[in-house]
């Protein structure tokens, strides 16, 4: 995923932004250091691409028990108010968001990363393949990215 900011704290402090392929690199860190890396990405704005009618319908079908129930990341993405259930409040928030209106729920359009951060102790070699998974609250149809 491009344009993700990775904040590094610990024995050094810096940040980098992923390139168009989602790659990133921290350079010139002191050997043997202890670090925490935390990814963040600016939330979508109401009406922007990424959340649309298909997402609202997916959440509504889950709520009404029509078809295959949502699970995993899709279920998390549909539960925009984070109350552990997908209901009318979530569906309306997703609808309002893709129409360009405030959803009234702060999570709608925000990114969530897994893991939320990574901690490294005594780093003496390059740490490769340190990927994060991401979802966007409200993006029920295609919530995962790497």
Predicted feature residues:
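Cellulosome-associated attachment modules in secreted, modular CAZymes
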Residues: 1-146
């Amino acid at each position: 995923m491009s344009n993700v900011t990775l904040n590094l704290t610990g024995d050094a402090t810096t940040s980098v932004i992923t390139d168009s392929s989602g790659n990133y690199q921290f350079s010139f860190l002191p050997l043997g250091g202890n670090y925490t890396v935390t990814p963040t990405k600016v939330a979508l704005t109401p009406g922007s691409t990424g959340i649309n009618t298909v997402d609202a319908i997916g959440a509504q079908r889950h709520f009404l028990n029509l078809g295959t129930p949502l699970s995993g990341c899709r279920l998390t993405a549909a539960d925009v108010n984070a109350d552990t259930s997908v209901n009318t409040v979530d569906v309306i928030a997703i609808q309002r968001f893709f129409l360009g209106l405030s959803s009234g729920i702060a999570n709608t359009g925000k990114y969530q990363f897994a893991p939320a951060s990574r901690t490294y102790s005594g780093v003496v070699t390059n740490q490769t393949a340190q990927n994060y998974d991401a979802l966007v609250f409200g993006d029920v149809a295609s919530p995962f990215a790497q």
